[in-house]
Amino acid sequence: GGADVIIAGRSYDPSVFACLPIKEGFDRALALHMGKILECAAICALPGSGSDCMFGYLRKDHFVLEPLSKDRKCTTLSVAGHTLYEKTDPYHLPGPGGALDLHGCHFEQIDDNKVKISGTVFEPTDGYFLKLEGTRLVGYRTISVAATTDPIMISKIDSIIESVKARVKDNFDNYGIKDYYLDFKIYGKNGVMSMFEGIDGHIGSELMVVIEAVAKTQKEADTICSFARSTMLHFGYEGRIATAGNLAFPFSPSDCHMGEVYEFSLYHLLKVEDPKQYFPVEYIEYADGQRKK
């Protein structure tokens, strides 16, 4: 339409780089593949960086990537490895209207810091789908961060957590407060990988304990977190020798408001006949700083 300025929402990161080449007749697969790499800046280079620049040269049957910093270079391994970035399947990359098939993709080192990529194929889906995402408010979060180096407590940390949870439940059941979430994230013992079952990692000589409470109101979350923290601080576990507190707190006050908590309430693919009908283009003309009617 000849607009001088385009204001648009971004729903698919590679499209910012791929839209103009596709409009000009370049291969959709190559344009999207290049866009998927460029939208991460220089992460595909060595050393990688999300705050440095990468240049892409798109040709009819391939594209070339070149970092603009003399301190970085692209290698076939670094570029190919980027395909795993935030992906569970490096050969099949779904997106609007289809997916990129990288089974036949070829990476070639053409000089010390440039890599040539070819062979990417775009496979259209049976129909066009729009991704719909939405969230809902589930409550308010309060956390407390603490640590322990007591080897006896560390050896019994799982049973201690279960006992503390049981005591919290028993206390708040008496007040009719049952709709809450209480969790203990233990860093130094699968704090990062605890979401995956069956992973038994090394237990460190010290643990960081993050107590998290989510409830309907911030006041309830504060109270639950405070009670859980106090209970764990003074919990008399089996074999305990220490008579003072079980936990060390790096901050005072020990509890922190984290505010509103949301969760996905809508995560859906909507099949449509024409995706453009949901995103109409409006042209607005300005002259001398004023909008023309």
What kind of region is each of these model predictions?
Residues V16, P21-K189:
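Small-residue-enriched flexible segments
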Residues Y128-K293:
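C-terminal non-catalytic interaction/assembly regions of soluble proteins
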Residues G1-A8:
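An acidic, phosphate/nucleotide-engaging active-site surface
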Residues R10-V16, K216-Q218:
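Gly/Ser/Thr-rich loops at beta-strand to alpha-helix junctions
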